[in-house]
């Protein structure tokens, strides 16, 4: 199955749909984003060039620029495992509603959840504006209230103050 995102005139993601692989095949039997886009335009009656309409293919298995395979576990659940074939990595991230498509980066960027967070240019994900200062002696977490890193506490005790187990 393939996934396509419908974008508005500002490249905001309006919806994401599933398209059968058979609708992506060209006359030689090769998958083609253009064929999938054409099918989306016909089925959804939203043509590229119409006001507020463009379709872009997105990869369900790509996150932070890394392509993952779904591997079934012995208990019947699935686990994402980094693929040895990273040529399948596509547009940095899966498209999420209210996220954006950045044509300069050819990447889908998820919605910004926290004020002040910045885009990581490698992963096209949002993150705190400064690096995590955690060390082996202290752990920090981002506070959206103070918009800064704060030392983590467990039951009112700063993590750095919690006794470490003896070797």
Where would I find each of the regions flagged by the language model?
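Viral virion structural and adsorption modules
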Residues: 1-167
